UniProtKB/Swiss-Prot annotation:
S-adenosyl-L-methionine binds at C392, C393, A394, P395, G396, G397, K398, D416, D443, D460. Transmembrane segments: none annotated. Residues 24-56 are annotated as: Interaction with NPM1. One of its GO terms (cellular component) is nucleolus. Residues 1-211, 591-812 are annotated as: Disordered. Residues 1-13 have a biased composition (Basic and acidic residues). The gene is NOP2. Belongs to the class I-like SAM-binding methyltransferase superfamily. RsmB/NOP family. Residues 595-812 are annotated as: C-terminal domain. A motif (Nucleolar localization signal) lies at residues 40-57. Keywords: Acetylation, Citrullination, Isopeptide bond, Methyltransferase, Nucleus, Phosphoprotein, Ribosome biogenesis, RNA-binding, rRNA processing, S-adenosyl-L-methionine, Transferase, Ubl conjugation. The modification Phosphothreonine is found at T185, T195, T739, T776. This is 28S rRNA (cytosine(4447)-C(5))-methyltransferase.
Length: 812
């Protein structure tokens, strides 16, 4: 029952097996009862197609050579189609097709019938569908009859290419001179099928109003009982929904808050919900809430739940990034360049092979390294033929990066305090082909005692790890305030030690980079601000064109304004581990004197020794306090007189000259120790040296040690009444003075300005002569620890004098 095949004819429409045999409609007429036009039964798809074809025939008649009066005979119309409907089609055009009694659906265009006509004309066959009384109809009678529903389903399968039928319909309408838009046709169908007063649009409006009411309903904090239930057995979906609601309320707190609720209540509820949903401890979550805004805080917590992408750094000592990328792609690795800021980085999305065990990795062509750990080396910018220190080098990623930037020239000293981690450094440096590195194992805080004078120093200080939570989720709960402060104190010590290791006079360097993988202010800005106060360094730009600026003010703290040049990196904004980078420039190798000796975290080196700077005490204290101090020291002199007597006996000084010893300052152990503790205190009473005056109080307090000659001498030379009788500061000679020998007497008493050199007559050493010799103007004098000494004449001018029967050398 197939049709003839013409190989030159292009096939159109569905296949020939999808069409039904012609003439089935005539058989249906025999089985179906006749119905009137008012109550017409729904036509089959085939009958509708033929009816539409006949209606369109009258429209297309003028363009064809057919007679315009040719109309289908009324007697041959199928049942269900009236002659009036067919006649109106030629008068009103295609719009009458929609007004014909066709049931609920508009008849499809006669695209398939046109194809059937063309096929029948080519095959020379008679279209039995147009002949209702054909003799072949008896041969095609179905024993079981035909069901219109089954015909509709089969015809639907034959009309799958809807676009093709619509295109043909538009072509026919254009040929008839009528232009119809698809929107107008659809609107007419909707008007026929659903009236404007029907229910579905009202239902949609009702749904929309309900949705608006749900959106406008304010959020209400749950009661205490529900909060306790969430703490015991939390419903994560409900907790997450509550987090979103609270964050939305806090953005517009004045308009959306619940009456009688304060902002602190919402914040406390949010903090508890975040701790439950993301499994954070209260301490660390509180630190993060102080650090980020609420909307950014949720993004940061979400980013910590996702691991950072795997990144690797190309070893330019052995290969190029282009060659390495091609080799890894051939092995099934999906990768891309890391970014415009890196010339050697690659980011790996997925891999069919272990990325850490490829032949390229074993050959040292690349190093698995995080993107954030490449930034400190780029900020340091090491140059060729320099001396560089990596104070905390393990596991060797930054050290090898510096070596490849230096092209294996110069010297790199890689130091780490952990001997076990140094093993990985050795392995990586050998694999990557680094040859300019020396590995050391010292405590970084004591490193300036070992070696110094480096051009550049890199300090990747140990920290709490709050920036790498995605790698170590245990940080969420095992950190507290003590851990943060302990790390901060260690970082201060290491940073001062690193600064002392830098050579400020370096022609190409003098730079230091300090970095941590933490985001807390206590470990970053606080430490940097401390170093700016303790050492002669300043902050310089890091050279990185991205990253957020460091804090210059955080809560109650205020930092140096130059901290804006530091850089912060976060996982939710830069898709890398949290990191902090600061770059210093050292401009002097000296240490500020104001910070010397009283720094708790200063590195104990030889440059930290205190310097003794003499300064007059009377310039800073009133005269009354000076007199009181002098009297107190006179009482001490009383108890130390036996030492004075032994000193006189050792140095051959007569008892008559005992009073002159009161004008000589001595440095005791207490005074020496105080000078090292506070350099602002003077070493001795300078004013007492300039104006030595002795009153009768000394003779009354120590009568046993004074001879009768001394008493008479003091009475004769006592100053008149009314003059200044201030007692100078008198201290007993120390043990060091007592051990001095007479041969040291040739050294001068002190290089004070205005000291007159006079020769004394050949007589015993008297008090008046000594006072006249040491009558110096007021002014600061350096401390002295020597006994009575003056300028010594040449040996030829030495004279002898008798004192109590003993020969003694007099100083002229």
């Amino acid at each position: 029952m197939g049709r003839k095949l013409d190989p030159t004819k292009e096939k159109r429409g569905p296949g020939r097996k999808a069409r039904k045999q012609k003439g089935a409609e005539t058989e249906l007429v025999r089985f179906l009862p006749a119905v009137s036009d008012e109550n017409s039964k729904r036509l089959s798809s085939r009958a509708r197609k033929r009816a539409a074809k006949r209606r369109l025939g009258s429209v297309e008649a003028p363009k064809t050579n057919k007679s315009p009066e040719a109309k289908p005979l009324p007697g041959k119309l199928p049942k269900g189609i009236s002659a009036g409907a067919v006649q109106t089609a030629g008068k009103k055009g295609p719009q009458s097709l929609f007004n014909a009694p066709r049931g609920k659906k508009r008849p499809a265009p006669g695209s398939d019938e046109e194809e059937e006509e063309e096929d029948s004309e080519e095959d020379g066959m008679v279209n039995h569908g147009d002949l209702w009384g054909s003799e072949d109809d008896a041969d095609t009678v179905d024993d079981y009859g035909a069901d219109s529903n089954s015909e509709d389903e089969e015809e639907g399968e034959a009309l799958l290419p809807i676009e093709r039928a619509a295109r043909k319909q538009k072509a026919r309408e254009a040929a008839a001179g009528i232009q119809w838009s698809e929107e107008e046709t659809e609107d007419e169908e909707e008007e026929k099928e659903v009236t404007p007063e029907s229910g579905p649009p009202k239902v949609e409006e009702a749904d929309g109003g309900l949705q608006i009411n749900v959106d406008e309903e304010p959020f209400v904090l749950p009661p205490a009982g529900e909060m306790e239930q969430d703490a015991q057995a939390p419903d994560l979906q409900r907790v997450h929904k509550r987090i979103q609601d609270i964050v939305g309320i806090l953005r517009d707190f004045g308009a959306q808050r619940e009456e009688g609720r304060s902002r602190s209540e919402y914040l406390n509820r949010l903090k508890k919900d975040l701790a439950i949903y993301y499994s954070y401890g209260d301490f660390l979550l509180g630190k993060l809430m102080d650090l980020f805004p609420l909307s950014e805080l949720v993004e940061f917590l979400e980013a910590n739940e996702v691991p950072r992408p795997v990144t690797l750094r190309t070893n330019t000592l052995k290969t190029r990034r282009r060659d390495l990328a091609q080799a890894l792609i051939n092995r099934g690795v999906n990768l891309d360049p890391l970014g415009k800021w890196s010339k050697t980085g690659l980011v790996v999305y997925d891999s069919s092979v272990p990325i850490g065990a490829t032949p390229e990795y074993l050959a040292g062509h690349y190093m698995l390294q995080g993107a954030s750990s490449m930034l400190p080396v780029m900020a340091l910018a090491p140059q060729e033929h320099e001396r560089i220190l990596d104070m905390c080098c393990a596991p060797g990623g930054k050290t090898s990066y510096m070596a490849q930037l230096m092209k294996n020239t110069g010297v790199i000293l890689a130091n780490d305090a952990n001997a076990e981690r140094l093993k990985s450094v050795v392995g990586n440096l050998h694999r990557l082909g680094v040859t300019n590195t020396i590995i050391s194992h010292y405590d970084g805080r004591q490193f300036p005692k070992v070696v110094g004078g480096f051009d550049r120093v890199l300090l990747d200080a140990p920290c709490s790890g709050t920036g790498v939570i995605s790698k170590d989720p245990a940080v969420k709960t095992n950190k507290d305030e003590k851990d943060i402060l302990r790390c901060a104190h260690l970082q201060k010590e290491l940073l001062l030690s690193a600064i002392d290791s830098v050579n400020a006079t370096s022609k190409t360097g003098g730079y230091l980079v300090y970095c941590t993988c933490s985001i807390t202010v206590e470990e970053n800005e606080w430490v940097v601000d401390y170093a700016l106060k303790k050492r002669n360094v300043r902050l310089v730009p890091t050279g990185l064109d991205f990253g957020q600026e460091g804090f210059t003010r955080f809560r109650e703290r205020r930092f140096h304004p130059s901290l804006r040049s530091t850089r912060r990196f976060y996982p939710h904004t830069h898709n890398m581990d949290g990191f902090f980078i600061a770059k210093f420039k050292k401009f002097s190798n000296s240490i500020p004197q104001s910070q010397t000796g009283n720094s708790e975290t200063a590195t104990p080196t030889n440059v930290d020794l205190p310097q003794v700077i003499p300064k007059s005490e009377n310039s800073s204290q009133p005269a009354k306090k000076a007199k009181g101090a002098a009297k107190t020291k006179q009482q001490l002199q009383k108890q130390q007189h036996p030492k004075k007597a032994s000193f006189q006996k050792l140095n051959g000084i007569s008892k008559g000259a005992d009073s002159e010893l009161s004008t000589v300052p001595s440095v005791t152990k207490t005074q020496a120790s105080s000078s090292f503790q506070d350099s602002s205190q003077p070493a001795g009473k300078a004013e007492g040296i300039r104006e030595p005056k002795v009153t009768g109080k000394l003779k009354q307090r120590s009568p046993k040690l004074q001879s009768s000659k001394k008493v008479a001498f003091l009475r004769q030379n006592a100053p008149p009444k009314g003059t200044d009788t201030q007692t100078p500061a008198v201290l007993s000679p120390s043990k060091t003075q007592a051990t001095l020998k007479p041969k040291d007497h040739h050294q001068p008493l002190g290089r004070a300005k205005g000291v007159e050199k006079q020769q004394l007559p050949e007589q015993p050493f008297e008090k008046a002569a000594f006072q006249k010799q040491n009558d110096t103007p007021k002014g600061p004098q350096p401390p002295t620890v020597s006994p009575i000494r003056s300028s010594r004449p040449p040996p030829a001018k030495r004279k002898k004098s008798q004192s109590r029967g003993n020969s003694q050398l007099l100083l002229s």
